[in-house]
C-alpha cells in the first residue's frame, strides 16, 4: 500500500475506536465491530479525515464562510439555512485530487468496480459516548462505479453542513471549524429484512429489555418512516411482547444502482419480518456488541439467508445513566433534585460537596443525586411511612414507587422495620409551641456559622482540606439536632392536621394556606420582601434607574456610586447581598455563581419592583397577609364552634393554628444555614483554585469544578492535575444537560416519572399538585432564567423549578406553575406565604404553555386551563 493510500484510505479491519479523529465516529465503531468474534460486518474501507482536510483546503472561500457561521446564533434558523446551503455547494464543487481519487479507486478494485456499495458519512463529533448524531449527515445506498462513488463521497463531505447538523453543533457548543468528515464505503448487502436493535428500551430506559424494530427489504423504509415496523420486546432470552404491523411497502436495490420503493403483496404484509427465534438471536448478538462498547447500543442490522449483518452501531445517548452499585441486587432510587427543586445537572465538585454534607448516602448518575430507598420499600411499616410521606409531598413520586412495587419480586420483602417517617396527620412531636424554640435554634446555628467563618480564614493549602471535613461534621451536627427535626416536623404536621381536619369538619380544602400567610421568621419570604425595600431606595432616583437598565456585567456597584443617588442605591444592594448574597439559582451546587459573585442577576428583578410597586409595598404586603390569616382564623373558629362538639374542635384547631404559625416559617431556615456554609466553603476553595491558576497548575480556576473534593485535595497536595480527566468531565456535563432526570430510577435503568390518577379535571387541562389555594387568571410568563425576568403585575410565572433564590420574583406575580415540586418544597411554601395560587409538578409545563398565553391556575384543585 503506497503512502497516499495509507494516509487517505484505511480498511475497516485496520480501524478501532481509538481512531475517531481519523475515521470519525461511525468508522471507528464499524472498525471495532469488525473485530468482535461472531459479528458479521460488510467489508469496506474508510476515506479518512485527512482526505477531507486535503480537499477543503483547496477552497479559500470556505474559511470565510465558516467564520461567518461561527457568529450566527443557534436560534437564527434562517441564517443557518442560508449559510449551510452555501457551504454545502462550495464543498461539493471542489474537485477530488487525482492522487486521492486513485487511492479510492484502488480500494474499490479489491472487490471489483461493479460491486455495489453503501457510502456513509462519518463525522468526528458523531456517535460518541456523549452525543449521537444519528441521521444528521447523509448515507447513500447501492452506489455502483468509481465515478458515482467519488461523487457521493463529496456529497457526504458536504453533508457535514446540513442545517440540522449545524444547528445541533451550535446548540451543543461544538465549533463547526473543528469537526472533520470521514466517509465509510461498505459493500452492500441485500437483505430479506432489516431494522434497528436497541439493546435497552429507548422509551423506559430498562436495560434488561431489548427492542427490535424490523421490516422487509432495506432499512431505509423504516428510517424514513415509510412503514411502521414490527416491534419485538426481548427480555432474558425470551420475546415478552410483539407488535406485527401491516407493512405495505419496502425499499429494494436496483441493478444499475440506487433504490426504489415497491409495494408488498397483500398476503405478505401481515407476516412478521422476523421469527421470535431470530429476534432472540439478534438480541444475543446485540448483547455481545453492548459488552464490547460498555454501554447500550442502537444497532442497524440486515438479515441475509438467516445470517445477521451489522451495518452500524452507536451509543444510545438519550438513556439516563444508572447509579453504580456494589452488588447485583435490584435497587430503587428516588431523585434528590426533585425534593430540592433543582433538577439541573451538577458539576463533580457540587455533587461531591453535597454528598460530603448530606445526612444520608447519595448515589450519582447523570450529574444528579439519588437516594436508594430499596430497604425502606421492602418492609411493610417503613414502606407505608415512605409512601405516605411521598404521597403528601409529591404524588408523582408515590405513583412511580407504587408502579415498581406492583412488579412482582422486584423489591424483596423484609420483616417490619421502624416507619420511614411520621405518619402524615398524626399527633405532632412533643415539642412545645414556643417561639423560643425557634429562636434558640437560629442562635445556635448563627454561632456555629460565625465560628466557621473565623476558623476557615486561617487555613490554606493542605491544611484547608484537612480542616473542611471537620467543618462538614459540624455542619451535619447542626442539621441533625433532634430539636431541629422536631421543629420542622411540627410545622409540617400541623399543616397536614389543619388541612385534613378542616376539610373533614368544614368541607374546606387547604385552609392552612391562608392560615399561614405572613407567618413570622420565614427567611426566604423575607428575602423577597427585602428586595422590595431595595427598590424603594432606588425608585426616587431616575438616573440610578437609567444606569441599572444599562448594566451588562457584574462589576457595576462602584460605578453606580458615581451616579446621583447611587451611593444610597449601592449601599442598599450591598446590604441585601450581605444577608442573602450566598443564594443563587441551583444553589445546592456549590459551583453555581452566587448573587454576591454575580449581582447583575438581581438587577432585572429590582427594576421590575421599581416599575410594578409603590413605596412601602413590602410592609403593606406583610400586613395584608397577616390580616387575612387572622380573619381566616376567626372565621374557622366561629364555624367550628357552631358544630356538634364544637368547642373541643375549635380549641384543638386554635392550638394547631398557633403551632403552625410558630414553626412553619422555620421550615426555610435550615436551607439558609446550609447555603450560608456552602458560600464559606466556596470562598475558601476558590481562593485555593486562584492560587493554583496563578501558579500554572490550572488552565483556569473553574477547572476545579470538574473534580471531586478528594481530587481537588490531591491537586493541592501534588500540584498536578489530569487535564484529560477535566476535558472528559466537561464533555460529560454537556451531555447530562440534555437529559431529564426521572423522579424514580431502578437499577435496571427504568426511568419512572409517575402519573396523576385523576378524572376530576376539565378536558385539556394540565394536571398538577395543588400547593397554594386560590384561582387566578393572567398572562403566562415562561421564564427559564431568573436573570431574564421581565414581569408585570398580574403575570403568572411558569418555570421548571423554583428553589429559594426565585422568591424575589414571587412578590411580582399573581400565580405560579412549575414542572417540579411538592407540597412542602420551597416554592410551595413561599407561594403559600405570599398567597399565590400555585400548581406544581406539571409535566412539561414550560413546553405545553407558551409565553404570553392567558391561563387560569386552579391552586385549590390542582390544574391549569389554557384560555388563549
Curated annotation (Swiss-Prot):
The active site is at residue 826. One of its GO terms (biological process) is response to antibiotic. Its EC number is 2.7.9.6. Disruption phenotype: Disruption mutant fails to inactivate RIF. Mutant displays a modest twofold decrease in RIF minimum inhibitory concentrations (MICs) compared with the wild-type strain. Keywords: Antibiotic resistance, ATP-binding, Kinase, Nucleotide-binding, Transferase. Residues 5-317 are annotated as: ATP-binding. Belongs to the rifampicin phosphotransferase family. Catalyzes the phosphorylation of rifampicin, also known as rifampin (RIF), leading to its inactivation. Confers high level resistance to a variety of clinically used rifamycin antibiotics. Does not show phosphoenolpyruvate (PEP) synthase activity. This is Rifampicin phosphotransferase. It comes from Streptomyces sviceus (strain ATCC 29083 / DSM 924 / JCM 4929 / NBRC 13980 / NCIMB 11184 / NRRL 5439 / UC 5370). The gene is rph.
Amino acid at each position: 500500500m503506497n503512502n497516499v493510500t495509507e494516509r487517505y484510505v484505511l480498511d475497516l479491519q485496520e480501524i478501532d475506536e481509538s481512531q475517531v479523529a481519523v475515521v470519525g465516529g461511525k468508522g471507528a465503531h464499524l472498525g471495532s465491530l469488525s473485530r468482535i468474534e461472531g459479528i458479521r460486518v460488510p467489508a469496506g474501507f474508510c476515506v479518512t479525515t485527512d482526505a477531507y482536510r486535503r480537499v477543503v483546503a483547496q477552497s479559500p472561500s470556505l474559511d470565510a464562510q465558516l467564520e461567518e457561521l461561527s457568529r450566527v446564533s443557534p436560534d437564527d434558523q434562517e441564517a443557518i439555512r442560508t449559510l449551510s446551503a452555501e457551504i454545502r455547494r462550495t464543498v461539493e464543487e471542489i474537485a477530488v485530487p487525482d492522487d486521492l481519487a486513485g487511492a479510492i479507486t484502488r480500494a474499490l478494485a479489491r472487490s471489483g468496480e461493479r460491486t455495489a456499495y453503501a457510502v456513509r458519512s462519518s463525522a468526528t463529533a458523531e456517535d460518541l459516548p456523549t452525543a449521537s448524531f444519528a441521521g444528521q449527515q447523509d448515507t447513500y445506498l447501492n452506489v455502483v462505479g468509481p465515478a458515482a462513488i467519488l461523487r457521493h463521497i463529496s456529497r457526504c463531505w458536504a453533508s457535514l453542513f446540513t442545517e440540522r447538523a449545524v444547528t445541533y453543533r451550535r446548540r451543543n457548543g461544538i465549533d463547526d471549524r473543528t469537526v472533520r468528515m470521514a466517509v465509510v464505503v461498505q459493500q452492500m448487502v441485500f437483505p430479506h429484512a432489516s431494522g434497528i436493535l436497541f439493546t435497552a428500551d429507548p422509551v423506559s430506559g430498562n436495560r434488561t429489555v431489548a427492542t427490535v424494530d424490523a421490516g422487509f427489504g432495506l432499512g431505509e423504509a423504516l428510517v424514513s418512516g415509510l412503514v411502521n415496523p414490527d416491534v419485538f420486546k426481548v427480555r432474558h432470552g425470551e420475546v415478552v411482547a410483539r407488535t406485527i404491523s401491516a407493512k405495505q411497502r419496502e425499499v429494494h436495490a436496483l441493478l444499475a444502482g440506487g433504490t426504489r420503493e415497491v409495494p408488498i403483496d397483500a398476503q405478505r404484509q401481515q407476516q412478521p419480518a422476523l421469527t421470535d427465534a431470530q429476534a432472540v438471536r439478534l438480541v444475543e448478538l446485540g448483547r455481545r456488541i453492548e459488552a464490547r462498547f460498555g454501554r447500550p447500543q442502537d444497532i442497524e442490522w440486515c438479515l441475509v439467508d438467516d445470517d445477521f449483518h451489522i451495518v452500524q452501531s452507536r451509543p444510545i445517548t438519550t438513556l439516563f445513566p444508572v447509579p453504580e452499585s456494589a452488588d447485583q441486587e435490584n435497587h430503587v432510587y428516588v431523585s434528590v433534585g426533585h425534593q430540592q427543586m433543582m433538577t439541573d445537572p451538577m458539576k463533580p465538585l457540587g455533587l461531591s460537596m453535597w454528598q460530603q454534607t448530606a445526612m444520608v448516602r447519595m448515589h450519582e448518575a447523570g450529574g444528579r443525586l439519588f437516594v436508594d430507598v430499596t430497604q425502606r420499600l421492602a418492609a411493610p411499616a417503613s414502606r407505608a411511612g415512605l409512601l405516605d410521606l411521598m404521597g403528601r409531598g409529591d404524588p408523582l413520586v408515590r405513583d412511580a414507587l407504587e408502579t415498581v412495587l406492583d412488579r412482582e419480586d422486584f423489591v424483596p420483602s423484609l420483616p417490619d422495620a421502624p416507619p420511614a417517617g411520621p405518619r402524615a396527620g398524626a399527633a405532632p412531636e412533643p415539642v412545645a409551641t414556643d417561639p423560643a424554640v425557634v429562636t434558640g435554634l437560629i442562635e445556635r446555628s448563627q454561632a456555629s456559622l460565625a465560628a466557621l467563618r473565623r476558623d476557615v480564614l486561617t487555613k490554606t493549602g493542605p491544611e484547608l482540606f484537612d480542616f473542611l471535613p471537620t467543618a462538614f461534621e459540624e455542619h451535619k451536627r447542626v442539621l441533625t439536632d433532634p430539636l431541629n427535626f422536631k421543629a420542622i416536623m411540627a410545622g409540617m404536621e400541623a399543616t397536614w392536621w389543619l388541612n385534613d381536619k378542616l376539610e373533614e369538619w368544614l368541607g374546606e380544602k387547604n385552609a392552612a394556606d391562608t392560615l399561614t400567610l405572613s407567618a413570622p421568621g420565614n427567611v426566604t419570604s423575607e428575602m423577597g420582601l427585602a428586595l422590595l425595600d431595595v427598590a424603594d431606595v432606588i425608585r426616587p432616583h431616575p438616573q440610578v434607574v437609567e444606569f441599572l437598565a444599562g448594566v451588562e456585567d457584574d462589576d457595576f456597584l462602584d460605578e453606580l456610586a458615581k451616579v446621583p443617588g447611587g451611593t444610597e442605591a449601592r449601599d442598599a444592594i450591598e446590604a441585601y447581598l450581605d444577608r442573602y448574597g450566598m443564594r443563587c439559582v441551583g444553589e445546592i451546587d456549590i459551583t453555581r455563581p452566587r448573587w454576591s459573585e454575580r449581582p447583575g442577576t438581581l438587577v432585572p428583578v429590582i427594576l421590575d419592583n421599581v416599575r410594578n410597586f409603590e413605596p412601602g409595598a413590602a410592609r403593606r404586603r406583610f400586613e395584608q397577609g397577616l390580616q387575612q390569616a387572622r380573619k381566616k382564623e376567626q372565621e374557622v373558629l366561629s364555624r367550628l364552634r357552631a358544630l356538634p362538639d364544637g368547642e373541643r374542635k375549635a380549641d384543638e384547631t386554635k392550638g394547631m393554628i398557633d403551632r403552625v404559625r410558630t414553626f412553619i416559617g422555620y421550615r426555610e431556615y435550615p436551607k439558609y444555614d446550609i447555603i450560608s456554609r456552602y458560600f464559606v466553603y466556596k470562598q475558601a476553595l476558590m481562593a485555593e483554585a486562584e492560587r493554583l491558576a496563578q501558579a500554572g497548575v490550572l488552565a483556569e480556576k473553574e477547572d476545579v469544578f470538574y473534580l471531586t473534593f478528594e481530587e481537588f485535595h490531591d491537586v493541592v497536595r501534588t500540584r498536578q492535575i489530569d487535564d484529560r480527566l477535566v476535558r472528559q468531565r466537561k464533555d460529560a456535563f454537556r451531555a447530562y444537560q440534555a437529559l431529564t432526570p426521572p423522579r424514580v430510577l431502578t437499577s435496571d435503568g427504568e426511568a419512572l416519572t409517575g402519573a396523576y390518577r385523576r378524572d376530576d379535571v376539565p378536558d385539556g387541562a394540565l394536571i398538577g399538585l395543588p400547593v397554594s389555594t386560590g384561582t387566578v387568571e393572567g398572562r403566562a410568563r415562561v421564564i427559564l432564567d431568573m436573570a431574564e425576568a421581565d414581569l408585570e403585575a398580574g403575570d403568572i410565572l411558569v418555570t421548571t423549578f423554583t428553589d429559594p433564590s426565585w422568591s424575589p420574583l414571587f412578590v411580582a406575580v399573581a400565580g405560579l406553575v412549575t414542572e417540579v415540586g411538592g407540597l412542602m418544597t420551597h416554592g410551595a411554601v413561599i407561594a403559600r406565604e405570599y398567597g399565590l395560587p400555585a400548581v406544581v409538578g406539571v409535566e412539561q409545563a414550560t413546553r405545553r404553555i407558551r409565553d404570553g398565553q392567558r391561563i387560569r391556575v386552579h391552586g385549590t384543585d390542582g390544574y391549569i386551563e389554557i384560555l388563549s
